[in-house]
Amino acid sequence: MEIKRDAYLEQLKIRKDNGMIKIITGIRRCGKSFLLFVLFKKYLLESGVDNDHIIEIALDGIENEELRDPKKCYQHIKDAMKDDQKYYLLLDEVQFMSRFEEVLNSLLRISNIDVYVTGSNSKFLSSDIVTEFRGRGDEIRIYPLSFAEFYAAFDGDYDDAWEEYMIYGGLPQVLQFSVERQKAEYLKNIFTNVYIKDVVERNKLRNVDEIDTLVDILASAIGAPTNPTKISNTFKSERGINYSNKTISNHIDYLVEAFLISKADRYDIKGRKYVGANLKYYFTDVGLRNARLNFRQQEPTHIMENIVYNELLIRGYNVDVGIVEAYAKNDEGKTTRKQFEVDFVVNQGSQRYYIQVAYDMTSEEKQTQELNSLRNIPDSFKKLVIVNGTKKPWRNEEGFVIMGMKYFLLNADSLEF
């Protein structure tokens, strides 16, 4: 099965021969290698590039272990270049090579080679893009399958695809399995033996139980504000473990750097400033999150919120979670100052959207809860509520856009309704 990744392929096409190193980043097993070695290579061949002018090296393979040595890898590439015609280097999982930035910088000085690399650790790569390549590194972030990509490859209708996606997520390999047990075992296996193992080895962690437990806590708390102090207290009260705030903060950073989770900052809308303390964390793939909890804690509301968050990132938006303070009456009828939560504050250039995500908004109480947050925002940027189901978008009497999840996910310009 060939899954189309047209948006990412187009990003590579428009960067071809631009004199920069194209650095494709993202969580392992999200399809970076397939994009580079299958889809992009196919495009190069169809564009008239000879096969012997495409140099392919997968550094995570045992067959290329000796090429993890920077001098040997550089010489191997030079030896493969037999003439002055253009060559295309496809280098997979570059973080396996020590001093990889020296090799790539040396290749930049060769006029007839166009370089594409993939990597699975953001800190390891992103900092070097800025400092080592001096403006000549071009990063392309790849995610697991969006729902639209998943649905296009799925053998079934929307309802079945949506149920499957909410449980097993969008890692491409999941679509290859027809049996649910295989999907579950695959996700649980790679979480432990690929992702956690990578984090432990890369950061030289000695206590695997700590990072394991931290992942479990974060998986149980997607969409809920938390911070290292709260997590530390959970360790003490439930596990009897002293786990310092600093260590927790470092370990969370390791998970973010491995693209396992994303961190959403809290933004005070009226105060126009970021506020510290409680942040929200979301999993890059909800299937991995569910696998971590052995598929017990489904929580469709929070899973749906996680999927919306990921979709917004895929579309290139900057996404924060919002708070807005306003006066409101409490249960006793007294007017008090209250803090309202806005699920997402979404920015791209001069555009801004405020988004609430509601799995079910049929009751009047739930409608009031979701809409009050939007009502108290004192500006005119677009305000939307995304609800579960297939509802077509419409505007209510207050000008808020209400749309179903299906429309949001399957229409790339859905926020422009």
Region locations from a protein language model:
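Hydrophobic positions on the alpha1 helix immediately C-terminal to the Walker A/P-loop
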Residues: 35, 39
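Pre-Walker A adenine-sensing motif
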Residues: 2-19
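Interdomain hinge/linker elements that couple catalytic modules in large macromolecular machines
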Residues: 2, 148-325
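Conserved glycine(s) of the Walker
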Residues: 31
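Structural recognition of the conserved hydrophobic beta-strand(s) that form the central parallel beta-sheet
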Residues: 114-120, 141
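A cross-kingdom feature that marks ATP-driven nucleic-acid transaction machinery
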Residues: 2, 25, 34, 45, ...
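Short glycine-rich substrate-engagement loop in P-loop NTPases that contacts/grips substrate
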Residues: 55-85
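Short regulatory helix/loop adjacent to the ATP-binding pocket of P-loop NTPases
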Residues: 123-138, 153-155
